[in-house]
Amino acid sequence: MSGMGFLAVGVGAALGAWLRWALAILLNAVNPALPYGTLAANLVGGYLIGVAVGFFDTHAGLPPEWRLLVITGFLGGLTTFSTFSGEVVANILAGDHVIGVLHIVAHLGGSLFLTMLGFWTVRTFS
């Protein structure tokens, strides 16, 4: 592990986490049963990981620190499986089973779809 790699991951993670926090502040109050900030972070992150993987696949000559900054750091800090899991469990424990299932479908289905779309975007327009 290089010092620059360590720095790239740390800076990227801080920026991603700050964006996730901003999305939570802006969007979670809209509907507490389905916190849109967490959903937005995971869907945007899903799309951007597809774009990033496609981009780095076609730009293999870039220094590895860029991939660490964007994918491991920024997108790792932006997306959040633990918050998503906690929100789903809270819905289920509150008896809101339908909301819990919709939460799962929106996060997983939406993120997978947008990851494919992001990858397709880079492949199509490169």
Swiss-Prot record:
InterPro entries: FluC. Disulfide bonds: none annotated. GO terms for biological process: cellular detoxification of fluoride. It is found in: Cell inner membrane. The chain crosses the membrane at residues 6-26, 36-56, 69-89, 99-119. Na(+) is not transported, but it plays an essential structural role and its presence is essential for fluoride channel function. Na(+) binds at G76, T79. It comes from the Bacteria. It is a multi-pass membrane protein. One of its GO terms (molecular function) is fluoride channel activity. GO terms for cellular component: plasma membrane. Keywords: Cell inner membrane, Cell membrane, Ion channel, Ion transport, Membrane, Metal-binding, Sodium, Transmembrane, Transmembrane helix, Transport. It catalyses: fluoride(in) = fluoride(out). Pfam families: CRCB. PANTHER family: FLUORIDE EXPORT PROTEIN 1-RELATED (PTHR28259:SF1). Fluoride-specific ion channel. Important for reducing fluoride concentration in the cell, thus reducing its toxicity. Belongs to the fluoride channel Fluc/FEX (TC 1.A.43) family. This is Fluoride-specific ion channel FluC. It comes from Ralstonia pickettii (strain 12J).
